[in-house]
Amino acid sequence: MASSSSVAVRELPLFPLPEVVLFPGRPLPLQIFEFRYRIMMNTIMESDRRFGVLMWDPNQNKVSAVGCCAEVIHCQRLPDDRMKIMTLGQQRFRVLDAVREKPYLVGLVEWIEDAPPQQDLRPLGKDVEQLLRDVVRLSSKLMDQSIDLPEDIPSLPTELSYWVASYLYGAATEQQTLLELQDTAARLERETEILTSTRNHLAARTVLKDTLK
């Protein structure tokens, strides 16, 4: 079978997950217990070990059209036929059409990438990284405990933009918007806005805490 990166359009097994957004280069652990998804995993483990993760909004009962391909890098089979798997995000895709729905959803997808940058994105990336450090520093002060940034912060702007987006816990809709952007600069700029707002909020709380001491 040809690798997915060499095919512009292909069929891909799809796994909608409630309020979960996967980004390229980011890990996603899953526990597989539904029969249809056990069938899916058994099938893909005999081929290229890849499937598509789509964010499902349970409030609107809507599945996003843009998702991220996941590759199974580890699979543990349990005695009761459940599976514990670790996956890693690969490239993003857009669903063009549903091929079939049983025993599990399969879609016809096209791969999508960011447009070539029109500017040097390194300064924007450095701004985002500094904002991250500010947020961590202020969070540490508020919680009276040491919080360290993970050591795996990417240096390349595109990878950094995915890395930051993956840590926006509890904001699946915002994460989905960032996933769908095909402009690294626009993604980093939006993350700058989010982190600036977070930093300012934390700074205000820190001042209040110091005042009340």
Language model features: what each stretch is:
Residues 1-213:
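N-terminal low-complexity, acidic/polar interaction/targeting segments
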